[in-house]
Amino acid sequence: DLPHPQQARSQRRLACEQAWQNSGLPIQILRLPGIYGPYRSVLQSINTRRSKMIDKPGQVFSRVHVDDIAGATLHLIQCAAAGKWPVVVNVTDDLPAASKDLLTYGAKLLGRSLPPLEPFAIAAKQMSPMALSFWQENRRVSNQLLCQELGYSLIHPDYHSGLRDCYLVEGFKALQTNPL
């Protein structure tokens, strides 16, 4: 699918991609959605009690674990050496999800409670312009080209696997003896 960004920041990003494509240089654009990994996940905000459970029905975001960014990059280098060189590749996991779903799963891993669910209309009043723009678009992207056509096998196919990895790497075992 061709992107149809609504936000100015997303439109600038697409214009930058198009400029690179028109440069005549041998390029490959890796589109990365929400990036997370050890020491950069919802586990920190839950553990420090800074998380907000925002409810915006129908709102989902695609994400990717840093292990899969590295793995997909290496895989695409091998594909290029074999003559497969798509110009634009989405690097994302298989399960776009609402932010509240990640927080709920992260809280289960940590054995922590979460704040009450807050409707987006209320939460938006306290958001920065950058945060607000992030929530204005659905950010669901497909990894079909990467996984089905180019044969990359995800290390973390969904946020469950990715957050379990973060949990183990970050040493949260001390907080709960039976992680999910």
Model-based region annotation:
Residues 1-11:
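Active-site "gating" loop of Rossmann-like NAD(P)-dependent oxidoreductase/epimerase domains
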Residues 15-39:
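Conserved beta-loop-beta element that borders a ligand/cofactor-binding pocket
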Residues 29, 35-45, 54-77:
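Substrate-positioning beta->alpha
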Residues 46-56, 111-116:
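A short C-terminal helix-loop "cap" of Rossmann-like NAD(P)-dependent dehydrogenase/epimerase domains
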Residues 61-64, 97, 141, 157:
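Residue-level signal for the nucleotide or nucleotide-sugar donor/cofactor binding architecture
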Residues 70-72, 76-131, 176-180:
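Mid/C-terminal beta-alpha module of Rossmann-like enzyme folds, strongest
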Residues 104, 124-153:
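Conserved C-terminal active-site "lid" loop/helix of NAD(P)H-dependent oxidoreductases
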Residues 157-180:
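Amphipathic terminal alpha-helices
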